[in-house]
């Protein structure tokens, strides 16, 4: 199993879903974890749960649509812990919208959260990682970066941009031993996905119907993504940078039958 002992990690969007799964797993394998979410009480509650379980955890809150808040979140980690070793850019919005019908306001919000925030957080984290001799940045992307969906136009574009940024950053930061990798996530069962399905008018049967389309008999779980993130964050992947892991049950180019 990967070890993150003595590593300082920030996981954005870690008060629920995939982010919470990643942060919890990181804490369980030795990392000092900074929980982040838009609501301070939620972030503090998750951090308290981890501390009660014997782990090292702290919390910071903030709206990542604001560039100054992005900087503040990363700087808070550095100020409290003396540096940062691992950044997981997980926070994202999956609001629905087609390329034809989405408002400019929706487009701008999606790009701010899903693409600009990871960019700014990366910029700030690298300032600490370089003098520390390196670090690991893990971007949480989506299979939609490749194929898109008619009702996820802006979202898909933002995740495609994130993948391009991952590869560019990996090249630019290689000589500082800062590694940048990405996990493109497929259909995952989270509280947020449940909420979106209900907003789309689906009843409780949506999950049974969804599972029936999956060749391995279930949707992804946050724990699946957490294991992959721990690999990229740890020394198990010490010489891997610029890689994109597609965590999906359908290989690229294979259509569901």
Name the predicted role of every residue range:
Residues 122, 158, 166:
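Active-site helix of classical SDR
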Residues 127, 171-172, 238:
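Alpha-helical segment proximal to the catalytic Tyr-Lys
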Residues 147, 241-257:
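Short C-terminal tail/terminal secondary-structure segment
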Residues 8, 15-16, 39:
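Conserved glycine-rich cofactor-binding loop
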């Amino acid at each position: 199993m990967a070890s993150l002992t003595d590593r300082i990690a920030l996981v954005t969007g870690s008060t629920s879903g995939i982010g919470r799964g990643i942060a919890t797993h990181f804490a369980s394998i030795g990392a000092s974890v900074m929980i982040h979410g838009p609501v301070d009480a939620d972030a503090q509650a998750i951090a308290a749960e981890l501390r009660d379980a014997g782990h090292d955890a702290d919390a910071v809150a903030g709206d990542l649509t604001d560039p100054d808040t992005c900087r503040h979140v990363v700087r808070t980690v550095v100020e409290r812990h003396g540096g940062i070793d691992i950044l997981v850019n997980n926070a994202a919005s999956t609001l629905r919208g087609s390329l034809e019908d989405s408002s400019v306001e929706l487009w701008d919000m999606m790009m701010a959260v899903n693409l600009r925030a990871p960019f700014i957080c990366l910029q700030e984290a690298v300032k600490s990682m370089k003098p520390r001799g390196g670090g690991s940045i893990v971007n949480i992307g989506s299979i939609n970066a490749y194929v898109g969906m008619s009702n996820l136009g802006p979202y898909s574009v933002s995740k495609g941009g994130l993948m391009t940024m991952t590869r560019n950053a990996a090249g630019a930061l290689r000589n500082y031993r800062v590694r940048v990798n990405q996990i493109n996530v497929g259909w995952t069962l989270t509280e947020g996905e449940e909420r979106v399905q209900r907003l789309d008018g689906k009843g409780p049967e949506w999950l049974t119907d969804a599972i029936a389309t999956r060749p391995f008999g279930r949707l992804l779980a946050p724990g699946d993504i957490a294991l992959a993130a721990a690999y990229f964050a740890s020394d198990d992947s010490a010489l891997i940078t610029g890689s994109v892991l597609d965590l999906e049950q359908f290989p690229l180019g294979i259509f569901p039958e």
